[in-house]
């Protein structure tokens, strides 16, 4: 700001006469002094800049307050299955670690959403040895030893576990763990710490088990004579399940043994599965196999995840090499688009039209065939999804609706192509010009790395502030379960629901039924209830959310304006070879010196829109439990409206930044000028937007798919020295990395095309190709428009 407003020799305000702008929607007039982005400009939207700086100071204070009063350790405290905080609540104050009864349950794909469903208990220390109840061969002579190794829930009295039968009942009811692995604490959670190369732990008879042949069996459905069809379906499915499971178990063992990563298998008791299959118990109770199938599935998911991680650790260097190659491939593709853009676009359009035409023809043939043979269109009622889908496609009405839908899409597409064919040609020409502009100022390709780093800083900062704010407050504990307990007595007058202190509760409340006076209560406790948070913290949370959205949008706007200045300078330079070498640096300095207020204004508008959309998503999530059709419809309409509004505002903001980069006007004036210019060329705008969007997506998809195919071919061949479990894992990672990198580079290309498009529209309105008013556009664009220099 000092350079902007405190130095008169650097900045000279321009008057309205410096640049001739039209009123309302009149075309732009010729200005002999206009040579591209103005060097004489002033600070824009200073009140918005002052507001933004003030907000940043307030956000900084929020961060300082959060760090001073918050404690992240409070958020990392584990909670057992009964809701007790390990090491915090009175019953588990001396047990700070959390152990899982069946860790394989935590390998399910929906765990981040639904949580880990296995029983979880607090313990004083993590298990220091492996334990499996079935393998321990429980008998009266070793029952005491087994009981000492058991890990059970807090309300279980181990002294009651006097026989093996009682222990089995407690394990079956999930009150004690059947298996336990040696583990170490990680963030106060006991995580398995198993050495590799324990393949020998698999029973010998299991490793040498011959393939099992399935036998057909009947179910009790034979008794239902009136449901013969259902019986046949059920019999077939169960028979297939038996055969599949037999092959699945043996194949699983073969694969896991080959990859030497089966140390967990000793906990699965696979021999029970094999015995069940061999004895034929499925004939009488086919559901007996269900728990074994679930166990096999869970451990398979866990081992698959482990092998994927092993593949990544083994191949990460080559993955980085292929991603680095994708950077080079992206640059080559952008440079080549000036030659391949036209055939790529037209081949894609013709391909889509051809595919739709064939779809219409095929749908019509199917419709006629089914109408002519109605007997063949029998609908098979079956619970099988594939059968249900097949029944749909045997209906003439299904093909009629498909025919109508494809015909409408085809007609609309043909009309759009016919009406916009000339505009599509112009859009392709601008794509070629964009490729030239990016190649002329090659540093712009890597410039998006700067805003990406800044956005990463904003995300990390806002997340840390969120976590520290969430940890602020005083924990509130209340007495729970005292009324229902017949043996727990508190000598200090604690009553049910009273606010309590865990230490005082342990000292003054005792279980009178226990042998020793010092035994704590098991049926009642001082439970953590909530965190008493100061009211100002909620306000700070709101400030943090606003700061996150505003700064993310601000950084994105900064990138767009800098690139717009660079590409506008390239367009309005007649001799492209004389383009300033540090044109990108000039764009940065002009934006920082003069237009941060404009960026703050535009980004605030987008941020408000995003916040409203986030609130609507939150409300929709909360109201899903209520089955109210009217409420859902209103929310759906609001979400759709604000999505459309945000998309329009993003489009308008980008063009406003381009106009501001050229003329140095404030946000409102720039947005008005850009909107007027675009509305006078609305068909060209539509064609350019759709063609460029489609081409960019196609290019990114083509590039990412090609690099993924090369990666998979490499790892699936004999070239690499490493042996991977899944060659597709590095291929998927390379696909994702390449797509992200291509998106970064093509974001520059997108700004280039939009900037050149606005400059092109101004060029054809300001100039006529005469000696006095020559065009700035290339000869290719002049030829397409049927214009030439006079």
Swiss-Prot record:
Transmembrane helix listed as a keyword: yes
UniProt subcellular location: Membrane
KW Methyltransferase (keyword) present: no
Keyword entries, A-Z: Glycoprotein, Membrane, Transmembrane, Transmembrane helix
Protein name, UniProt field: Choline transporter-like 2
Spans through the membrane: 47-67, 288-308, 319-339, 344-364, 400-420, 449-469, 545-565, 592-612, 691-711, 728-748
Tree of life domain: Eukaryota
Species name: Anopheles gambiae
Gene that specifies this protein: Ctl2
Pfam families attached to this UniProt entry: Choline_transpo (PF04515)
Residues modified by glycosylation: 102, 259, 384, 483
Its membrane topology: Multi-pass membrane protein
GO BP annotations, alphabetical order: transmembrane transport
Main localization, broad class: membrane
Family from the record: Belongs to the CTL (choline transporter-like) family.
GO molecular function, one term: transmembrane transporter activity
Record InterPro entries: Choline_transptr-like (IPR007603)
Gene Ontology CC: one annotated term: membrane
């Amino acid at each position: 700001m000092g350079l902007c407003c405190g130095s008169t020799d650097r900045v000279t305000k321009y008057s309205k006469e410096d640049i001739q702008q039209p009123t309302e929607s009149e075309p732009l007039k010729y200005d002999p002094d206009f040579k591209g982005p103005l060097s004489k400009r002033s600070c824009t939207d200073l009140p918005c800049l002052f507001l933004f700086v003030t907000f940043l100071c307030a956000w900084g204070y929020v961060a300082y307050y959060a760090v001073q009063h918050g404690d992240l350790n409070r958020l990392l405290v584990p909670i057992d299955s009964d809701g007790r905080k390990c090491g915090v609540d009175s019953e588990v104050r001396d047990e700070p670690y959390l152990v899982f009864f069946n860790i394989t349950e935590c390998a399910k794909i929906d765990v981040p959403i639904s949580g880990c469903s296995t029983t979880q208990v607090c313990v004083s220390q993590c298990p220091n040895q492996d334990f499996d109840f079935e393998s321990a061969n429980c008998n009266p002579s070793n029952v005491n030893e087994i009981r000492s190794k058991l890990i059970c829930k807090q309300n279980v009295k181990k002294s009651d576990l006097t026989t093996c039968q009682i222990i089995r009942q407690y394990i079956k009811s999930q009150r004690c763990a059947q298996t336990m692995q040696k583990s170490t604490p990680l963030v106060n959670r006991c995580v398995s710490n198993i050495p590799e190369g324990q393949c020998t732990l698999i029973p010998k008879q299991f490793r040498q088990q011959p393939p099992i042949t399935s036998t057909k069996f009947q179910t009790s459905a034979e008794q239902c004579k009136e449901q013969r069809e259902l019986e046949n379906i059920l019999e077939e499915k169960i028979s297939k399940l038996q055969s599949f499971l037999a092959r699945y178990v043996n194949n699983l063992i073969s694969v896991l043994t080959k990859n030497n990563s089966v140390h967990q298998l000793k906990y699965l008791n696979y021999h029970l599965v094999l015995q069940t299959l061999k004895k034929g118990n499925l004939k009488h109770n086919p559901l007996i196999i269900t728990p074994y199938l679930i166990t096999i599935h869970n451990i398979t998911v866990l081992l698959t995840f482990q092998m994927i991680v092993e593949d990544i650790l083994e191949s990460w260097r080559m993955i980085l090499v292929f991603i680095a190659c994708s950077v080079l491939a992206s640059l080559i593709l952008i440079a080549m688009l000036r030659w391949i853009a036209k055939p790529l676009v037209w081949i894609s359009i013709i391909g889509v039209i051809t595919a739709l035409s064939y779809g219409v023809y095929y749908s019509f043939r199917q419709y006629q065939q089914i109408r002519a043979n109605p007997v063949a269109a029998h609908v098979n009622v079956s619970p099988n999804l594939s059968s249900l889908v097949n029944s749909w496609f045997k209906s003439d009405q299904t093909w009629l609706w498909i025919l109508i839908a494809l015909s409408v899409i085809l007609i609309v597409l043909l009309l759009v192509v016919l009406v916009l064919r000339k505009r599509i040609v112009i859009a392709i020409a601008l794509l070629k010009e964009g490729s030239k502009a990016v190649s002329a100022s090659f540093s712009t390709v890597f410039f998006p790395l700067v805003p990406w780093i800044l956005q990463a800083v904003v995300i990390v900062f806002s997340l840390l502030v969120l976590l520290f704010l969430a940890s602020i407050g005083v924990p509130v504990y209340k007495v729970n379960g005292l009324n229902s307990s017949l043996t727990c007595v508190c000598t200090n007058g604690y009553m049910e629901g009273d606010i309590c202190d865990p230490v005082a509760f342990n000292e003054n409340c005792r279980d009178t039924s226990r042998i020793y006076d010092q035994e704590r209560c098991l049926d009642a406790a001082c439970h953590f209830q909530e965190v008493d948070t100061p009211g100002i913290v909620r306000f700070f949370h709101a400030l943090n959310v606003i700061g996150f959205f505003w700064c993310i949008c601000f950084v994105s706007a900064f990138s767009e304006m800098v690139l717009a200045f660079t590409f506008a300078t390239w367009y309005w330079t007649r001799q492209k070879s004389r383009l300033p070498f540090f044109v990108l640096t000039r764009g940065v300095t002009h934006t920082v010196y003069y237009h941060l207020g404009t960026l703050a204004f535009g980004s605030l508008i987008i941020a408000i829109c995003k916040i409203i959309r986030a609130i609507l998503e939150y409300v929709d999530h909360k109201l899903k439990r209520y089955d109210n059709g009217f409420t859902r419809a209103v929310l759906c309409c609001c979400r759709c409206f604000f999505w459309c509004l945000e998309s329009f505002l993003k489009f308008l903001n980008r063009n406003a930044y381009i106009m501001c980069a050229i003329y140095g006007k404030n946000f409102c004036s720039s947005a008005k000028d850009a909107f007027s210019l675009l509305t006078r060329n609305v068909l060209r705008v539509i064609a350019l937007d759709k063609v460029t969007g489609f081409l960019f997506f196609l290019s990114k998809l083509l590039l990412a798919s090609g690099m993924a195919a090369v990666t998979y071919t490499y790892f699936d061949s004999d070239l690499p020295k490493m042996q991977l479990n899944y060659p597709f894992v590095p291929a998927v990672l390379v696909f994702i990395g390449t797509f992200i990198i291509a998106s970064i580079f093509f974001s520059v290309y997108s700004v280039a095309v939009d900037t050149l498009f606005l400059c092109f529209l101004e060029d054809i309105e300001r100039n006529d190709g005469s000696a006095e008013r020559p065009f700035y556009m290339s000869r290719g664009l002049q030829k397409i428009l049927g214009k030439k220099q006079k």
